[in-house]
Amino acid sequence: MRKTVKIITSLVLIACLFLLASCANKGSSSSGDATTLKVAVMPFLNSVPIEYMINNKLDEKYGFKIETVYFPSGGPMNEALGAGLWEVGTLSAASVYSLANYNAHVVADIGHSEGGIEVLVNPDSDILTVKGVNKDFPEVYGDAATLKGKTIAVPTGTISHLNVIHWLRAINVDPNTVNIVHMEFPQAYQALKAKKIDAAALNPPTSFSAEADGMKIVSSLTTLNIPQYDSIIVSDEAFNNKKDTIVLYIKAFLEACDALQADPNMAAQELLNWYTKNGSTSTLEACQSEVQTRPFVTTEEIKNIKTGDSVRITADFFASQSLITEDKLTVVDQNVDTELLGKALN
């Protein structure tokens, strides 16, 4: 009897492995049709142009078809890239992992993502008594004396962590003289309000809520002049096998960005609709603030942006924090492409 059970169990396991392998093979291959793209979307602003493209049939206009694949955030989206489940997507800081670990390619920077990446303090913080100690950053607050012994909460290994490190560097503060603690954004903000910490590194929408509640910005990617972009990321397979379609996708994406950027009220409503569609709660006012501080890159603006610069800034930071190895920096550089954008603009 036991032998029979073992045989049956083995057969079941083999069948499961076969099914998994079949699924993996299906996922790892591109869409059979060279003009169809599996496009990753997330419940954030950077996917609004994709929704606009679909609703306004821009994919049909340019002769290709979008099939969306939904992900809740950049982490799962990257893991799915490794399994070949999508071909084109839009990512910010997480794109470093796409390029370094999955040999994906960044082909265009299409949205400003530095807006709202801020370090905030209570309005009575002594950090606010010192401003512009570094003349290159006149809107940045704090110095070695006011930061000594302070506790700063931030989700480590994120773009907000990069903001903290560059803030300390800008005002010549040794990171060893402050306490940097890992804390997710909502918890960090609650701790700041309760004055259990001295500063919180936040991102939208939490940073906007903090500002509305009277918290003060002491550092941000904007005041530190650190550009960050949401970028169009392409899987290695699609990059090598669907270049003509990717060029058409970039054209359509930029047309969507032009339309959204030309009408901020429409863009805010589109964002609110997107949030609602994906189960998030927001207000039109909050969406208006977000599209104002995180504008889309237009066809004209993109001509003056050096593709991949912000990816390299983030990659350098990730390497300094041992989130990627130093040898991956070369891989990131090699996977920055400007050829397809050039074709899309011509």
Curated annotation (Swiss-Prot):
UniProt cross-references to Pfam families, sorted A to Z: NMT1_2
Biotechnology: Has shown promise in a 4-component vaccine with SecA (AC C0QZS7), BHWA1_00569 (AC C0QYX7) and FlaAL (AC C0QWY9).
Membrane topology, from the record: Lipid-anchor
Keywords: Cell membrane, Lipoprotein, Membrane, Palmitate, Signal
Organism superkingdom: Bacteria
Signal sequence annotation: 1-22
Subcellular location, principal: membrane
A GO CC annotation given for this chain: plasma membrane
S-diacylglycerol cysteine: lipidated positions: C23
Location of this chain's protein in the cell: Cell membrane
Lipid tethering residues (N-palmitoyl cysteine): C23
Function: Probably part of an ABC transporter complex.
Family to which the UniProt record says this protein belongs: Belongs to the bacterial solute-binding protein SsuA/TauA family.
UniProt protein name: Putative ABC transporter periplasmic binding protein BHWA1_00430
Lineage: Bacteria, Pseudomonadati, Spirochaetota, Spirochaetia, Brachyspirales
Gene: ssuA
